[in-house]
Amino acid sequence: MTQPLKALRTRAANLEDAVAIAEIYNQGIADRVATFETEPRTPAQIAEWFKAGHLIMIAEADGTGAVAFAAAFPHSSRPCYAGIGEFSVYVARAHRGHRAGRAVLSALVEAATGRGFHKLVSRVFPENAASRVLLNRLGFEEIGTHRRHGQLDGVWRDCVIVERLLEHGGAPDL
């Protein structure tokens, strides 16, 4: 079993974290295992997330700075979907498998519950086993699959849909 990082802590991200968040996100984009995005993001683009009021948490470890982030944003601008957040989680390559993803997603769930979110939803590539295991352990349910939902490098990809209701008790006991 992989050992957890020592001195891992989570906190709400701020604008000063935009560079680190962009670096982590760009690793995920390059690896092609967690997003349909193909173009690297700049810190200025990440800064727009803060200006839009997105909920962003980071995990820091052993004085290395941010090693993971989780972000939630409105699922839709339509009023009927108010309170539903769509989220993403990314972990720096060197820190994958060390529970940073678990820590930062747990912090996001807690913060989203505190902000009054009703539900969190996301999409995961079917072969992303690590994400699927993490999501299951944190109380997310796989509720279906979007078939050929988007193209990545010219190939139509499926996405597993996950969700977690937050209104009945918040974060699970870990």
Task: Please identify what each model-predicted range represents.
Residues 8-21:
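A short beta-loop-alpha structural element at the N-terminal edge
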Residues 18, 22-48:
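Conserved GNAT-fold acetyl-CoA-binding loop/helix
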Residues 38-94, 105, 111, 165-167:
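Acetyl-CoA-dependent GNAT
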Residues 71-74, 79, 121-124, 136, ...:
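Conserved catalytic-core motifs of GNAT/GCN5-like acyltransferases
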Residues 96, 122-132:
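Conserved beta-strand-loop-alpha-helix junction that forms the acyl-donor binding cleft
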Residues 97-111, 132-137:
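Conserved acetyl-CoA-binding loop-helix of GNAT-fold acetyltransferases
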Residues 99, 128, 154:
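Conserved G/P- and acidic residue-centered "switch" motifs that form tight phosphate/ATP-binding loops
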Residues 112-124:
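Conserved GNAT acetyl-CoA-binding A-motif
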